[in-house]
Amino acid sequence: IFVGTVRDDGIEAMEFESFDEVAIKDLETIAEQATEQFSLNSIDIIHRNGLLKVEDTILVIVVGAVHRPEAFEGCRFILEEIKRYVPIWKKDIHTRGEEHWHH
């Protein structure tokens, strides 16, 4: 299980937006790749959109596998692939009032 949260590193909040139609297809593709590559039995991925404050949960990845190494490696693969190409953008809202959008 991986749970990603909004960190308190000068950020007051983060806002997430996604191109849902493409993001869902991309997440399904990533799950299929991870299942094949790491022999995973089950995968659940939840990524939130909208305004999230410090310590709020952004992303949850739950994988099931017969062996721990495959589960951990599969979970990491899923996380890195989400960050690499799923169309989800985030806006950092800094405590100083600055705001920055990025992928």
What are the roles of these predicted feature ranges?
Residues 1-57, 64-103:
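N-terminal, polar/charged subdomain of small-to-medium soluble alpha/beta proteins
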